Amino acid sequence: MYNSIIRMILPIAVTFLLGVLIRKIKLMDQDGCNTLKRLISKIMLPVVLLNAFLFADYNGGVMIIMAVVFVAMLIMFGAGFLLSRLMPERAKYMPFLFTTLECGTLGYPLAAMLFGALGTSHMAIVDVGHTVFLFLIAVPLLQSVDGGSADAKSILKNAVTSPTFDTMILGILLGVAGVDERLAASAGYELYQSVVDFISAPTGMLILITLGFDMSLRKDLMKPVLFTSVLRVVIMGVLCAASCFIIFRFVPYSREQLCILILAFTLPASYGLTTFARFEGHNDYVATTVSFSTILTLILFVCLTVFAYSGV
């Protein structure tokens, strides 16, 4: 068992450190890293997400999970707003770092490492509730705070121009229409799956390299960063326990679903927030908080992997 866990965790650690090394030896500059991110977000992740939403199991339990996750995100935003009063110099953007989940570039690859396609399907259900919160609540509020437009036209534009949102909607529509069953029963299914697997295979590796490359832990920012990151993890832990209790009162328990819910609640704030606001005067704080939260996520993922395969 422990050999299997080490085989799963070691590549993650090595690849993340490889990203740090690439930056240190200047093998790639920030433009190169940004190009990798665009490749991941506009091509590779949409393929992963479309496949996950297409083959997700849409039943009554899905709506419960979506609703619980949405409410949890609202509670986290409220908690961030209240706690931001303790650090007024960072109060403007702190609530946004307490809520949202980086399901796209981190949650799906880690879920796939745990349980393969089943893991990504479970994460997709969690991501629906989160994505609705992101585009209906978080982004409009963020743009309003940042001095931008938060009207209905702006909200709609942000949603329809997001590959994550587009693939989520398309995957759900195709899945509900039964395209997944017809595709799985067709002669072309193996060909389809081989193409999806080939395109999505390096996604996790490339994401970890970019995360390692972007890691920035400035000493002068560590107090607000630690305050935000650690409190986020603690409150998310409490919300995760409450959410799992509620969900499994209505949804049949499965160890895989439990582990994916725990994984989701350990994820850092959405990296996509930086594309919707300037964070003027707070860029370093936001970037460093996300970097540190990502490290915490990877550490907690190690613990989750042990739990997932320990049989406890």
Region spans (language model):
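Alpha-helical transmembrane segments of multi-pass small-molecule/ion transporters
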Residues: 1-312
